[in-house]
């Protein structure tokens, strides 16, 4: 059996889909708005 080597990095995750990154663009703000409307406890990473 081979090991799962792709662990994921928190810095990259934040840079790609963090709250401040979302707020930068119009579509990102739309994502946040949609998640607020749906009642998500976590809006972004």
UniProtKB/Swiss-Prot annotation:
Name the PROSITE patterns for this protein: RIBOSOMAL_L34
Question: What name is this protein filed under?
Answer: Large ribosomal subunit protein bL34
A Pfam family reported for this protein in Swiss-Prot or TrEMBL:
Ribosomal_L34
GO biological-process terms attached to the record? translation
- Annotated keywords: Ribonucleoprotein, Ribosomal protein
What are the start and end residues of every segment in region (Disordered)?
1-27
Q: Which GO terms describe its molecular function?
A: structural constituent of ribosome
Superkingdom classification of source: Bacteria
Compositional bias annotation for Basic residues = 10-27
Family in the record:
Belongs to the bacterial ribosomal protein bL34 family.
State the GO CC annotations. Answer: ribonucleoprotein complex; ribosome
Q: Where does the UniProt annotation place the signal sequence?
A: none
């Amino acid at each position: 059996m081979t090991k799962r080597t792709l662990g994921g990095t928190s810095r990259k995750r934040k840079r790609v889909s963090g709250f401040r990154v979302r707020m930068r663009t119009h579509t990102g703000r739309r994502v946040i708005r949609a998640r607020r409307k749906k009642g998500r406890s976590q809006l972004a990473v």
